Amino acid sequence: MEKEAAKRRVEQLHALINKYNYEYHTLDDPSVPDSEYDKLMKELIALEEEHPDLKTPDSPSQRVGGAVLDAFQKVQHKTPMLSLGNAFNEEDLRDFDRRVRQAVGDVEYNVEFKIDGLAVSLRYENGVFVRGATRGDGTTGEDITENLKTIRNIPLRMKRDLSIEVRGEAFMPKRSFELLNKARIERDEEPFANPRNAAAGSLRQLDPKIAAKRNLDIFVYSIAELDEMGVETQSQGLDFLDELGFKTNHERKKCSTIEEVIEIVEELKTKRADLPYEIDGIVIKVDSLDQQEELGFTAKSPRWAIAYKFPAEEVVTTLLDIELSVGRTGAVTPTAILEPVKVAGTTVQRASLHNEDLIKEKDIRLLDKVVVKKAGDIIPEVVNVLVEQRTGKEKEFNMPKECPECGSELVRIEGEVALRCINPECPAQIREGLIHFVSRNAMNIDGLGERVITQLFREDLVHNVADLYKLTREQLINLERMGEKSTDNLLNSIEKSKKNSLERLLFGLGIRFIGAKAAKTLAMHFETLDKLKKATKEELIEVDEIGDKMADALVTYFEKEEILKLLDELEELGVNTVYKGPKKAAAEASDSYFAGKTIVLTGKLSEMSRNDAKAEIEALGGKITGSVSKKTDLVIAGEAAGSKLAKAEDLNIEVWDEARLISELKK
């Protein structure tokens, strides 16, 4: 076939295959038999092989799986992919409703299924799917584009040429899971514990052809730029996603009172067992986007949504032993070793016992019959003992007086429940501290997980965090399961971590009571490690959210000579000790136009993102709110501004366009 004719036919085939694909996988209403679909796909692949330049990224042929990858690249999300706060009972839902109504008044809620899968983001440029990523830590995920292309419900080209980031939950249907596990058992392979693990494992395959065989599915539930799309509610946003050709879950309801929400939750709960996919709860969202913006976010989750989690499944098994582990702060934690038992779809052999007091309070003994559940359907825990089933063979358990790792005396610090090893040279504490230092929310050194750290420690190659930056290629390549490529990738990752902003280093150091949020607050305030090291307790407690306990821990930490020596060594090795994030509002912000003003952003900005505009205005002393009122000083209106612009005009509030905003920001 000649080139022009081939081009026209390829375009026709794209349109036909995409249409049939949408009918079959999204509408569940096919208009042609499978044989016709297969014939068209075969013709398209043949034409693309004959004319390789006609193969485009949005071609339906690209769903079969591309080349094998060496590793997953990191991807920065346009806006954070936060997790949701949890509700476990009716009272939790009522508390959520009270908080929402106190903040914004009357509301409507959108109630949706919480799909039990893997949260993903889908990036489209001019209507074409260009990148897909996992949630990761909420800010940065992993690029799994080629694997996501194998999910036939993800349109490779939308029905409109928009540039947006769509959020959804990829999952494995129950039937696909059963067939996959049946095939794995027949091949003498370990079956997956549950559909969620199977979906996550499939999407993290370096070979997309494996993912293509797994018959994954997806429901999408939001657009990162939803408020720029001219829609005003979450429910309108879902309808808009339907119009664009995405698959949304139609098991959703709107309601205006918490009583209605609770009724709907109970109704939807009864459908769980009969669904063709797994759900692990119900999501309740404030429907109005204006009210969502007004409610805002905590560090971890939106204030305008909550996930009702189903009551955990409980089972009975035998407690065989109690194992002790020493954490990075020296706390000794007991863990129950159980006779293997299935709980919520996974085999459980270990469960948390938290501390000595809990063991005594519940009178837990070795060989007891115990009730086990998964807290929040994730972490197994021992609920209680079936005392009536005791046979007399059970044995009492007593916590040791010495550290199980180093033999030092264990102490209980006043006001705490945990027994602690206070030996700073305890090998378990050092090892756990190293694992924490390289973790995702700390220095984020990809490829340097628990297994490699344990090997390095066992081979006497690392004794503290500074030693990680002295590792050589020769040392790493000799470790188990470390080839040339993985060694080079790890060295690159270690080198890259030197450029991290100060808050990651602070969190990674594992200072008592200093979590990721406090580390960010301290880094923003003091801006350099040198200033923080010299801060007095009085200066520390002046910082927002830093209390006496944190201040004391920081002063004690930075008084230690060995710590100061370690920090100096890290600096000499090239590790950054300066805050690189957005600066707190500078003193000169008081001279800016925005200082002290209440400002509303609405519509789509073309020269900068809404998040960037918000950050810059706040850095100059402005306060961004989600709704227009008499207290609003300024409305900045982009394209498709909608009701907020109309309300601003009604109230005679000053309105700027994007050009005026950029002009003011440049001053």
From Swiss-Prot:
GO terms under biological process: DNA repair; DNA replication
Keyword Metal-binding tagged: yes
Cellular component, GO, one term: cytosol
CDD domains: BRCT_DNA_ligase_like (cd17748), LIGANc (cd00114)
EC number(s) recorded for this UniProt protein: 6.5.1.2
EC supergroup of this enzyme: ligase
Cofactor(s) listed in the protein's UniProt record: Mg(2+); Mn(2+)
SUPFAM superfamilies on file: BRCT domain, DNA ligase/mRNA capping enzyme, catalytic domain, Nucleic acid-binding proteins, RuvA domain 2-like
Positions contributing to Zn(2+) binding: 403, 406, 421, 426
MF term (GO), any: DNA binding
Residues annotated as domain BRCT: 589-667
Record PROSITE patterns: BRCT, DNA_LIGASE_N1, DNA_LIGASE_N2
Entry binding sites for NAD(+): 34-38, 83-84, 112, 135, 169, 285, 309
Record keywords, A-Z: DNA damage, DNA repair, DNA replication, Ligase, Magnesium, Manganese, Metal-binding, NAD, Zinc
Domain of life: Bacteria
Active site: 114 (n6-amp-lysine intermediate)
Role of this protein: DNA ligase that catalyzes the formation of phosphodiester linkages between 5'-phosphoryl and 3'-hydroxyl groups in double-stranded DNA using NAD as a coenzyme and as the energy source for the reaction. It is essential for DNA replication and repair of damaged DNA.
Recorded family membership: Belongs to the NAD-dependent DNA ligase family. LigA subfamily.
Protein name: DNA ligase
Gene name tied to this protein: ligA
